[in-house]
């Protein structure tokens, strides 16, 4: 019977917090923009950890954007340093190899949101009728 919150899940969550702080404080390369660590998926044998990141930007970014490619290159090259720091912070005997990926989910959710707004337009979700208000502050109306 599988547990709801396994050790691998707990390690992934803790790695996400540690990596977010390390990238913000320790990685000094200017090619790395404002990185957000969205998710960490750790393999069952703790051999690998896939880290999904997104970048803060004013424009829509894709995996092929130069900013994204530069950030991924720097982070993958710094993965050995980051792996050592994570291992020391978490006191793990076996520290997974880190693989950084661009998280496409944010772009897909923005696209879905835009499509929904275009389909719905300016229509309110529920038409409102002031006469159907069950609670009234007007005592004359209640009398």
Swiss-Prot record:
Residues 119-143 are annotated as: Disordered. Coiled coil: none annotated. Belongs to the RbfA family. InterPro entries: KH_dom-like_a/b, RbfA, RbfA_dom_sf, Ribosome-bd_factorA_CS. Pfam families: RBFA (PF02033). Disulfide bonds: none annotated. GO terms for molecular function: ribosomal small subunit binding. One of several proteins that assist in the late maturation steps of the functional core of the 30S ribosomal subunit. Associates with free 30S ribosomal subunits (but not with 30S subunits that are part of 70S ribosomes or polysomes). Required for efficient processing of 16S rRNA. May interact with the 5'-terminal helix region of 16S rRNA. PANTHER family: RIBOSOME-BINDING FACTOR A, CHLOROPLASTIC-RELATED. Residues 119-129 have a biased composition (Basic and acidic residues). Keywords: Cytoplasm, Ribosome biogenesis. One of its GO terms (biological process) is maturation of SSU-rRNA. It is found in: Cytoplasm. This is Ribosome-binding factor A. Monomer. Binds 30S ribosomal subunits, but not 50S ribosomal subunits or 70S ribosomes. It comes from the Bacteria. The lineage of its organism: Bacteria, Pseudomonadati, Pseudomonadota, Gammaproteobacteria, Pseudomonadales. GO terms for cellular component: cytosol. The keyword Cytoplasm applies. It comes from Marinobacter nauticus (strain ATCC 700491 / DSM 11845 / VT8) (Marinobacter aquaeolei).
